[in-house]
Swiss-Prot record:
Recorded family membership: Belongs to the IspH family.
Gene: ispH
Name of this protein: 4-hydroxy-3-methylbut-2-enyl diphosphate reductase
HAMAP family: IspH
NCBIfam families listed in its UniProt record: ispH_lytB, PRK01045.1-2, PRK01045.1-4
Source organism superkingdom: Bacteria
This enzyme's EC code(s): 1.17.7.4
Amino acid sequence: MEIKLANPRGFCAGVDRAIDIVNRALDVFGAPIYVRHEVVHNKFVVERLKERGAIFVDELEAVPDDVIVIFSAHGVSQAVRQEADRRGLKVFDATCPLVTKVHMEVAKYSNDGCECVLIGHEGHPEVEGTMGQYDTANGGAIYLVEDESDVEQLEVRDPTRLSYVTQTTLSMDDTARVIDSLRAKFPHITGPRKDDICYATQNRQDAVKQLALECDLVLVVGSPNSSNSNRLRELAERCGTAAYLIDGPEDLDKSWFANCKNIGITAGASAPEVLVRDVIEGLKAIGASAPVELQGQEENISFSLPKELRV
């Protein structure tokens, strides 16, 4: 069995920054450091940070007074920010700058009283944070759609003043179809000048398509609650290749590889490379050869840390 590695794969700049913020805060201020929501959607990463003294909570009401709290890479609503300000909590914001870009778009539409459609997955923390940027006090409204059927049922107040934004970790192909449906139903709808789906999501989806065409089976390293990891698995399957989402080598099932000559491995944007290496070792133990790295899009993007943590 030959192993082929997608390129690029794994951590993106926003995830790197978010994890660095938690680690630097622990270095500078010591434990405990509170983090609202999992800083990134990966079990391994979260457990390592817990071991260092990070405490993950779902809501700010679980955070004591006079402590440091970090907002996750997925972003938070304005209501959460206001609560933190009201309580005087010291906040470090690990929101991905590309999510912040979407937040700013929504805030602009809100201030203009322009209705807004968000394409995204209901219940995902990024979606909750983005929806929470819209203030209906200016007379507008924000709507959430996930697929074309949602668009068919969508009714807005003024279709001549309507815009859309998207969650950053969606399937590019699915999102394009939803946007086409929106444009067909609401010809005056406008969108962002630059696509809201982030560069890392696009690059990893392009890479997994190539991987799926060259392999009998694709393994996506990532946690079940990772949106972008799930999209990679779905995309490989749509290419006609069997695909599995795994947290690590402990999830490997020998029966998957009975008739496989080429096994592809990729990783979601929140999955560390160490897990990929562990999976490779697990495959070698059942007869796989050394991995071959495929050609792919080079990434050299990085995001700066808050000033207090640049030590």
